[in-house]
């Protein structure tokens, strides 16, 4: 999954991921440093990595729970930092 952070947004491709399979997030930034945090449907932080300009950091996660996951920036990156939220969906293809 390709992820890029920018003031003050995340771009995510694709936005639907499979449950029960390892997913690799390739995370970068187009401007300043950002903190890439993945939160499960219950609001718990389940993984994090730095998003930095000029670098691609890899985060690997396996999602056992279907539902809506949120991405939040956890490193202050400017005045609208608090609005830097995105989401993706995890679906179970076995159902």
Protein language model features and the residues they cover:
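Residue-level signature for short turns and capping positions that connect secondary-structure elements
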Residues: 8, 41-43, 76
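Short acidic, gly/pro-rich beta-turn/loop elements at beta-sheet edges
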Residues: 13, 35-37, 46, 69-71, ...
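Beta-strand cores of secreted/periplasmic/IMS beta-sandwich domains, seen most often
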Residues: 1-7, 11-36, 57-65
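Histidine- and aromatic-enriched segments that form or immediately flank copper-ligand environments
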Residues: 3, 28, 32-52, 86
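Short amphipathic alpha-helical surface micro-motifs
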Residues: 18-19, 40-43, 68-72
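Extracellular/periplasmic metallocenter environments
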Residues: 51-95
């Amino acid at each position: 999954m390709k992820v890029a952070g920018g003031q003050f947004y995340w771009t995510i491709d694709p936005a639907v991921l499979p449950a029960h399979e390892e997913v690799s997030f390739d995370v970068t930034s187009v401007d300043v440093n950002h903190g890439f945090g993945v939160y499960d449907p219950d609001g718990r932080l389940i993984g994090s990595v730095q998003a930095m300009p000029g670098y691609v950091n890899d985060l690997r996660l396996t999602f056992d729970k279907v539902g809506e996951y949120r991405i939040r920036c956890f490193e202050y990156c400017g005045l609208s930092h608090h609005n830097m939220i995105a989401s993706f969906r995890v679906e179970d293809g076995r159902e």
